[in-house]
Amino acid sequence: TQVQEEELFKYLETHDKQLLLMIKFVSYNFLRPIEVCRLQIKDINFEERQLVVDAKNQLQKTKIIPELLFKEIEHLKGTNPNYFLFAPQGVESWETNESNKRDYWTKRFKKVKEVFGMGSEYGIYSFRHTFITKLYRQLRKTLTPHETKSQLMLITGHTTFTALDKYLRDIDTELPADYSNLILQASR
């Protein structure tokens, strides 16, 4: 829920700012946790506010960094380009494989989930679903479904309408209006 999300962000702001920043990369840049784990300083173009990401389905993709996220990392300009954005003690080198990195962050988030009594169905990846859903619903307030999906594709990095449609269906982005009248009419 919106309240739960706000409480969780507030808790992380006090107790684990680094984990919060990781979640913001997933939430605001619509990255997968494994993609966030790969990020190094050299992947950030500070002048253009862009990020080069080693993605799931293509070698690399370039994404803009939204202003509300960029403000939190602009101080890193000039840091060792080979440092990872997300290492156990902050921005530094981290010599281990990607699976270990993702597992580390998953376990770190698990401790926060325990504080909030959240079940195993919630993970860092859930924030990607949540924020894509929020963005979709916000865009739908003023755009047609097709226009919404066109805009969303640019933001999320989905490369085809088919892939985006499947993703949106899988996370129940659009719910129908109450259809009680249809049931009543069909029952006559």
Regions found by a protein language model. Name each.
Residues 91-93, 181-188:
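C-terminal secondary-structure termini that scaffold catalytic or DNA-interacting sites
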Residues 66-119, 138:
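Active-site/catalytic core of tyrosine-dependent DNA strand-transfer enzymes
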Residues 56-58, 156-182:
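Catalytic-site neighborhood detector that most strongly recognizes the C-terminal catalytic loop/helix
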Residues 13-14, 79-81, 106-154:
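Short, basic (Lys/Arg/His-rich) helix/loop patches that form interaction surfaces
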Residues 11-13, 34, 47-71, 78-79, ...:
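Basic, Lys/Arg-rich DNA-contacting stretches centered on the C-terminal catalytic core
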Residues 2-33:
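Basic, Lys/Arg- and aromatic-enriched nucleic-acid-binding interface segment
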Residues 43-48, 141-168:
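Short, polar N-cap/turn motifs at the start of nucleic acid-interacting alpha helices
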Residues 26-48:
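Short, charged phosphate-coordinating catalytic segments
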